[in-house]
Design a protein with these regions (language model features):
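Outer-membrane beta-barrel strand-turn architecture
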Residues: 2, 51-55, 100-106, 175-177, ...
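Repeated loop/turn-to-beta-strand initiation elements of outer-membrane beta-barrel proteins
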Residues: 6-8, 56-59, 105-108, 180-183, ...
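Outer-membrane beta-barrel "beta-signal"
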Residues: 7, 257-278
Length: 278
């Protein structure tokens, strides 16, 4: 007897950090606190095609989108500076897995996971009082500012990574509605990290304010006039010479966590199986 069955599924779910790594810090007048998490945390959407070779074993190809939750990079609350910087994933991925039916309702799958596109988006707000040195520099340029004047910088930066290979595993339960449709719920684990390749500013603006909040100068720095030490695009590599380390457009590479554990719910449409006795 030969057996073949094809089904398609659509699902959504939410994942939390698994073995979270440090993503940033909070600093205030009393101390410093680490923040841990994973860029794999958030809401995901998946479509999947599964082909069963027999009543137990099959192969599964899926494509998904991750709308990642905000992760704290930096949060500073000091009398002279306030920073609120978060980053979040907007990523596309694919997986190829083997599927095994333990019973007619319980199944498991495991296989390879690949991030195929997207970005990690950083959104930063930085309010910083001018130092005395900066006030003196403005005065030397003929622009006298009172003590307590400050800058407000807002920017968005997109980070891209090298395509990584990871691991996916899931255990699920399906409930048949009829001969073609079924609902399912599953617990899913992703094990993957992303090595950064480059980043690029999408927007950048710094305004200058007087102590009472009056705007003194709009667009002190912009995308066309970045401050010293700030590059429009940064490339990441495993090695840098001493000369390259002084170049703001080059930085050492780092890996960021995407591992997660989540719950998915969805619906499956099962095409009529093709089986015959010979």
């Amino acid at each position: 007897m030969s057996y073949a069955q094809f089904q398609v599924s659509a699902s959504t779910g939410y994942a939390i950090a698994s073995a979270g790594m440090k993503t940033g810090e909070s600093i205030n007048s009393s101390g410093t606190e680490n923040h841990y998490g994973s860029y794999g945390e958030g809401v995901n959407f998946q479509i999947r095609g599964t082909y069963f070779f027999n009543e137990s074993f099959g192969a599964d190809l899926s494509f998904g989108y991750l709308n990642g939750a905000d992760q704290t990079i930096s949060k500073v609350d000091l009398p002279t500076q306030q920073v609120d910087a978060i980053a979040r994933a907007r990523a596309y991925g694919a997986s190829l897995s083997m599927v095994y039916k333990f019973t007619n309702n319980v199944y498991g799958r495991f296989g390879a996971l690949l991030k195929i596109g997207g970005k990690t988006e950083a959104v930063v707000s930085n309010r910083a009082d001018l130092t005395q040195t900066q006030l003196d520099q403005f005065a030397a340029a003929g622009f006298t500012l009172p003590s307590g004047s400050y800058t407000q910088t807002n920017y968005v930066e997109d980070f891209h990574g090298v395509f990584p290979l990871g691991f996916v595993a899931a255990l699920g339960y399906k409930y048949d509605l009829n001969s073609n449709f079924s609902l399912f719920a599953e617990a899913e684990y992703y094990g993957i990290s992303l090595k950064r390749k480059d980043s690029e500013l999408q927007s950048f603006n710094t305004d200058l304010y007087l102590p009472d909040g009056t705007l003194a100068q709009a667009g002190l720095y912009t995308m066309d006039n970045l401050p010293a030490g700030r590059a429009l695009k940064i490339t990441y590599s495993d090695e840098l010479t001493h000369a390259e380390q002084a170049d703001p457009s080059k930085e050492l590479a780092q890996k960021v966590p995407y591992s997660s554990f989540g719950i998915n719910i969805g619906i499956t449409y099962k095409f009529n199986s093709a089986s015959k006795v010979q």
